Amino acid sequence: MQLNGSKTERNLLSTFAGESRARNKYTFYAEKAENEGYEYIASIFEATANNEKAHAREVFNRFLKMNKNTADNLKDSAEGEAHESNNLYKQFEKEARAEGFTEIANFYKELQEVEGNHEMRFMKIYENLEAGMIFKKNTDVKWQCMNCGYIHIGKEAPAFCPLCKFPRAYFKIYCEDYK
């Protein structure tokens, strides 16, 4: 049987969208309950949000098989962000402005810029991945272990953190964003 193009595929896509939407909604409800002083209720919303995430993951990975490899996922993400930035939110801005919803139109205008930045970030990471430059640079840089904070200076991240022994996968370029 061919899933592609079937009603079942459409149902799975709808299920994924619904479970994803419910997860976010319950997360936001949890934040509200927490802000209002209801920790127990917040924990129920969070637990349910995690259940919804598990449901969405099953549909996404097991049935739709949409979670490929990291390189393909980066390209797919860049394409999605480009679509939102260049098409979808431009249209939404135009429609909101035409209907007189200036604040909402301005929101979509700003959102286009953010989504465009997301596209560029995903593409740059994709290019670095394809070039073998995720854990390697042409000059010495500071690499930071995301587990323990250890800083290594060199052209490559170490194979393992000398402090906590976590693997290279936990290293990123150190960014001093507090200056």
Which residues make up each language-model segment?
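Non-heme di-metal
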Residues: 1-179
